[in-house]
Amino acid sequence: MDTSSSSGTHPSTFNNLTKQQELTGNDPNDTNRKRIRVACDSCRRKKIKCNGSYPCGNCIQAKNTSNCHFTERPVRKKLKPTKQDNKSTANSNGVSKRKYNDTFSGNSINIKTEKQENTTFGINDNKSSDLESRLSRIENSMSRMMHTLENFSQNFMTQAIRNNHSNSSMFNNNSLSPTPSEDFNKSAFDSEEQQTSHSYKNLKDRVKDANELLKLRNWDEFVGTHSITCIFSRESLDWMEKTLGSYGEEYLTPIRNLPLVFHSELKPYIMKWIDPPVVDKLQRKKLLESPFPTDSKLISKLIDLYYEETSMINILVDESRVRSLFAAYYNNFAEPIATKRRRFKLSELLLMTSILLISLSCLTEDDFSEERITTPASSTSSNYSAASANLLGDYNKNRLIALQNSLENSAIFYYHRISVISEGLETVEALLMFIIYVESNWLTSFFNYTIITVTIRFAQEIGLHRAETYNNLDLEEATKRRKIWWFCYFFDIEFSFKSGKPPVINTNDVTTNSDEDLLRVITQLKQYGPLSPKDRMYSPVCHTISTSLLDLSGSDSICLDILKIIQSGDILDDPFYFQFCALLQSRIRSNSYHDLFIASAEKRDFSSISNTLEKLNADMFELAMYLADEAKPRFYNDPKFTSVQASTGTSIRRDTILAMKLTFFSHLMIINRYPLMIATEDSKFDDRVIKFRNLSLDSARTILMLIKGWHRESASALFYNWAIYFPVAAYLVLVAAIINHPQLPESGTNLNLLIETSLSFFKSSKQWNSSNDSQDKQQNSTICVNKIVAIELIVRLMLRVVIKVYELHNNVEILANNPALQNHLQEAEEKFPDIFQNHAEFTSKMIALVGASPFGGCGSRNTSSCNLRDNSTNHGQNNMNPSPTITNNTYNSNINTGSNSTGEPQVCYAQSPSYNASLSNIINNESTGRSPATSTSINQSMMNENYDLFNDYLIDNSAVNLPFSQFNNLPNFFFDNNLGI
């Protein structure tokens, strides 16, 4: 047998294959090829895949072999075989040449063996070489990118140092990293691998340095970032003044003068806390045994009129308990045997006093008292009657204010004692009630931080924050304690977000009112069965939950299951529903603070911040999903959105729903501003920052739309004073958005909303309209009187600034075409012209008016140098007969240190100046604690002796140790210029 036929390919066959390869340019023996070198003309015309054979597979299938034609192409030149055939050399792409040498030389011997070698070794070499080539190209590209990034990083660090630390010596040239050009010069003689490694390490070091520079001012965020008050910080005011250019000083001067005015308003109230009257043995006996008026009917009617309107109080302390306390108090005077009389604890006295103060504060405020006294039929309270209104009508406003001032001094006396040594659960309860009263005053609520802190510490001492301490208690006592702890938890986080203070409670150490604790309570409630609807602790809602929740299974959240159960039905009149929803909101708000604002929160990576914020937003929206339909928070552009004016139901129900919605949108507004307040190296490249900004602004717009048409006369003074914070905060957020980006299309819409809100909701109140009425200038001691005027003044001043910024940047006229708006803004300057004066000139007048710092004390006990309390106030106070046994209450009239010619008592405070008729009414207001008839002048030596801390403020422009001094250290409220819009 011919060995050639068995050992190799037949010569004729080989010649045909060679001819086909020359004709088509394709190797017919290479069956693994993915691409062909030449396709036939028919396949090329039809743009279909050709197998490259002759005739090709497509033409054979179409039975059109005669038309299968390959256009002539130059035949590839045969490569000359090298001497070292067994050695394969790599081309520039790392592909072995051995295969091509053997193929194109026509040597078909051992083709199968050659293919196996390629399969075994050639492909592996190809993959390895190709990977090395790609890595080399990537390294070259990264080297070029690093050069650009290093230049960017260097410029960024230089700008950060120039802006934030221009006066600091801690950054010098020796501490900075080498410049990019120096790095590349040093690495010019290195290998490519060494250069890449060095550049990468250098880039990491520079990014780290940039991050450290960004974090150097994170102390600014310790206070104020999660609050809205930082808009009045020094940095914020300087930024606004710079934005206004040549108009900056004119428009910012009245805002800079406001702290001086606030100090004059706060001084009488501060004096009550830091320098209370001295109490002797007789006065102490009166405070412990007979601190209330002799008229028991007045007390009863005050409770009738206002107790039912304050749903928060009704949750904390049951009305029957309060009435029993006052009944026992007045029964003591009918008991002839002293040993049988009930001795009240200081905590009980503080509780009773706080309730009366809350009621009186509603009566003594001008914008709330008239309608509620003269039109009792409009009230929904079952206890409100015409007889009650007539009884209160016998007590004019001056007498009620005198009583309020007396009870306020008594409450501070009780607080100073029980804040040192607690009397147990009653102390926590009384302090919470006192917090409600102090919180109702916008100007003085900063005192609450200390009271809240003391209250929480006392609550933790008796274990209210740990669920295991409730195991051996009966259901009624355990429910009461959980309710008290809820108030502690609520006020802690509420005050934190309003004032910018850090919360006191560590949530990791709290188990009360957790999901496990709620499940335990529900299990106990199911054993009791239906309970009386009159018992607020065991409402029908609680019974519905106990009978339905345990039948559900597989849920991730017990709280959401509870909301599902009580989603329908008449539940909004039940205080438990508001309490429970506020608990869930407080949880999310607490998590927000601990995830975003604490020092240990991660701030270097914007992505992690965004992920955290998205989770918090999702929690808020999930909560809203399961709320009752009427209470469900909806944005202003939702078709189902309704304002307060369109709400139905009782005033309590309307206020409860409004409170839930305001809290919800306020929290969304604040936390979604946080990414705008920080600077990270990657925040400008993440489009989520725009989404957060839009969510914050939408929430602010929704708040202003919610209160549209809300008449303050329709709400109780307690609720209005608490809720007024939310529209003011939303107003300022939109102000900041417009000033930052006045040329955005949305800025015009936002400005129209601000103007409309100012002309409607923040319109002239009764106090504003009567501030120029000279015959109404009379002494009163309540600090609440000027609160509404201060808010309206702030709103008008900020609107004045934002309109000017918008006009300058858009070349439009807003005020010229709106006479009503002109009058609205002009009223502020007409009524309070002094705050528009030069800061130094206004300061000199304030020195002559305000006098000594309240922290300095009287340098002399000379009656001629002491400010005198209005005699009419003391006279009215004595006529009230506050004590059944002592008609002249010297303590509540303030301890007098001298007397005038008529023998009337006089009160010595820290040195105060005379009444100045040339100053505007915001200074000579009835709430300033001064009267022309009773004030005397202060000499210059006395002023220099006592004008310590306040004098420092006037000279150094920093309110050292004053309540508003923190504003100077708050961050810039307007820092959202990293948006790239």
Swiss-Prot record:
Phenotype for residue 736 to V/T: Gain of function (GOF) mutation that leads to hyperactivity conferring constitutive high CDR1 and CDR2 expression
Keywords, alphabetical: DNA-binding, Metal-binding, Nucleus, Transcription, Transcription regulation
Record InterPro entries: AtrR-like, Transcription_factor_dom_fun, Zn2-C6_fun-type_DNA-bd_sf, Zn2Cys6_DnaBD
Positions of the UniProt region annotated as Disordered: 1-33, 74-106, 165-199, 868-902
GO molecular function: DNA binding; DNA-binding transcription activator activity; DNA-binding transcription factor activity, RNA polymerase II-specific; RNA polymerase II cis-regulatory region sequence-specific DNA binding; sequence-specific DNA binding; transcription coactivator activity; zinc ion binding
Result, substituting residue 741 to Y: Gain of function (GOF) mutation that leads to hyperactivity conferring constitutive high CDR1 and CDR2 expression
GO BP annotations, alphabetical order: cellular response to oxidative stress; cellular response to steroid hormone stimulus; DNA-templated transcription; filamentous growth; filamentous growth of a population of unicellular organisms in response to biotic stimulus; positive regulation of filamentous growth of a population of unicellular organisms in response to biotic stimulus; positive regulation of transcription by RNA polymerase II; regulation of cellular response to drug
GO CC annotation: nucleus; transcription regulator complex
Post-translational modification: Phosphorylated. Phosphorylation leads to hyperactivation.
Skewed-composition ranges (Polar residues): 1-29, 868-880
Compositional bias (Low complexity): 165-177, 881-902
Effect of residue 980 to E/W: Gain of function (GOF) mutation that leads to hyperactivity conferring constitutive high CDR1 and CDR2 expression
Mechanisms controlling activity: Drugs such as farnesol and 1-dodecanol are able to hyperactivate TAC1 probably via phosphorylation by the Mediator complex.
Keyword DNA repair: no
Gene3D superfamilies: Zn(2)-C6 fungal-type DNA-binding domain
Xref: CDD domains: fungal_TF_MHR, GAL4
Effect of residue 239 to L: Gain of function (GOF) mutation that leads to hyperactivity conferring constitutive high CDR1 and CDR2 expression
Residues within the DNA-binding region(s): 40-68
Transmembrane segment boundaries: none
Localization: Nucleus
Effect of residue 673 to Q: Gain of function (GOF) mutation that leads to hyperactivity conferring constitutive high CDR1 and CDR2 expression
Protein name: Transcription factor TAC1
Species assigned in the record: Candida albicans (strain SC5314 / ATCC MYA-2876)
